[in-house]
Amino acid sequence: GVGFKAGVKDYKLTYYTPEYQTKDTDILAAFRVTPQPGVPPEEAGAAVAAESSTGTWTTVWTDGLTSLDRYKGRCYHIEPVIGEENQYFCYVAYPLDLFEEGSVTNMFTSIVGNVFGFKALRALRLEDLRIPPAYSKTFQGPPHGIQVERDKLNKYGRPLLGCTIKPKLGLSAKNYGRAVYECLRGGLDFTKDDENVNSQPFMRWRDRFLFCAEAIYKSQAETGEIKGHYLNATAGTCEEMIKRAVFARELGVPIVMHDYLTGGFTANTTLAAYCRDNGLLLHIHRAMHAVIDRQKNHGMHFRVLAKALRMSGGDHIHSGTVVGKLEGDRQLTLGFVDLLRDDYIEKDRSRGIFFTQDWVSMPGVLPVASGGIHVWHMPALTEIFGDDSVLQFG
């Protein structure tokens, strides 16, 4: 005999381990699980742990060639979601060895990969991740961080002000640059390429970069302040993206921009490394986030995408407004804003923080309040976001 029986077997025999003591090096995940009718929560939680780590639907002889105990994910705690029928929070611990160092891409491929299409689950949402210092230390994180950015800009003790150039599509490069100049000359710290602006027929990227650089230098000379424009380097290939970042560096501008979800984490980490090596700040836009995070019972909460961005690298990230035109709950927003900026964040379920997170010395990211805000929102925004933020109007 081969020492095992073939056939479909229950996951909970192997992957549900309520007695497990989590290790400091484990990556911990909190999932909101909605099992199919008739599937017990233990089986559903164990299935999540299995499918996102070493498990497959049956036993195979090659299982005997490794130590599954060392490499398997473990569902170590399950609790019902208060106020929801047939929903459970399932906590899963993953051994550190399952993940490639310095790769957000690999981390997500494992934790939020095939398991989300799993038949035994009606829906699945990743609510939070605890990233241990042993793993976060394998990432560079933000190219510069909040403190270095303030030193570069020589602006302290207040939120930074920005606006997005509108109409976002259709202006020629020359007129676009003119709008940038007027905004910066009028007192803003930053202007921004809309995320839709890459390199379209009506305005190619190189022309835009040139006229925006001119606007920056002219307004700097006239105001005596350091100015910036988020030049969108997002492109169809990594090579093209880096080419745009190189051109921005050659122009001597202070900051470039990237859409990190549509561009992908591999491209984002590549760009962040380039920005760090070349003294460019990196502004991150989150186009596509609502596809992933808007459903309450399926997908991923934005706090997970925010943590992933801090690891991958970015100096600014759009993080909702609470008061503008787009959706966002106040307490939960404050929770992930702290996760972006602070070194050490205590577990606090009222703010959606499922785990205590210790970033040790990884630089912080400035949250950007953007999306349908105007001057009447100022008092609320400064109260919610405090000094370390970018208020992005328009």
UniProtKB/Swiss-Prot annotation:
Assembly information from the UniProt record: Heterohexadecamer of 8 large chains and 8 small chains; disulfide-linked. The disulfide link is formed within the large subunit homodimers.
Cofactor note: Binds 1 Mg(2+) ion per subunit.
Cleaved signal peptide residues: none
Additional remarks: The basic functional RuBisCO is composed of a large chain homodimer in a 'head-to-tail' conformation. In form I RuBisCO this homodimer is arranged in a barrel-like tetramer with the small subunits forming a tetrameric 'cap' on each end of the 'barrel'.
Classification lineage: Eukaryota, Viridiplantae, Streptophyta, Embryophyta, Tracheophyta
Sites of N6-carboxylysine modification: K192
A molecular-function term among this protein's GO annotations: ribulose-bisphosphate carboxylase activity
Reactions this protein catalyses: 2 (2R)-3-phosphoglycerate + 2 H(+) = D-ribulose 1,5-bisphosphate + CO2 + H2O; D-ribulose 1,5-bisphosphate + O2 = 2-phosphoglycolate + (2R)-3-phosphoglycerate + 2 H(+)
Family: Belongs to the RuBisCO large chain family. Type I subfamily.
Site (Transition state stabilizer): K325
Keywords: Calvin cycle, Carbon dioxide fixation, Chloroplast, Disulfide bond, Lyase, Magnesium, Metal-binding, Methylation, Monooxygenase, Oxidoreductase, Photorespiration, Photosynthesis, Plastid
InterPro entries, alphabetized: RuBisCO, RuBisCo_large_chain_AS, RuBisCO_lsu_C, RuBisCO_lsu_C_sf, RuBisCO_lsu_fd_N, RuBisCO_lsu_N_sf
Keyword Endoplasmic reticulum tagged: no
Coiled coil feature spans: none
EC number(s) given by UniProt: 4.1.1.39
Any one Gene Ontology BP term: photorespiration
Role: RuBisCO catalyzes two reactions: the carboxylation of D-ribulose 1,5-bisphosphate, the primary event in carbon dioxide fixation, as well as the oxidative fragmentation of the pentose substrate in the photorespiration process. Both reactions occur simultaneously and in competition at the same active site.
A Pfam family per the record: RuBisCO_large
Binding locations of substrate: N114, T164, K168, R286, H318, S370
Active site, UniProt feature: K166, H285
Name under which the protein is recorded: Ribulose bisphosphate carboxylase large chain
Enzyme class: lyase
GO CC annotations, alphabetized: chloroplast
Binding site for Mg(2+): K192, D194, E195
Originating species: Alisma plantago-aquatica
Compartments reported by the entry: Plastid, Chloroplast
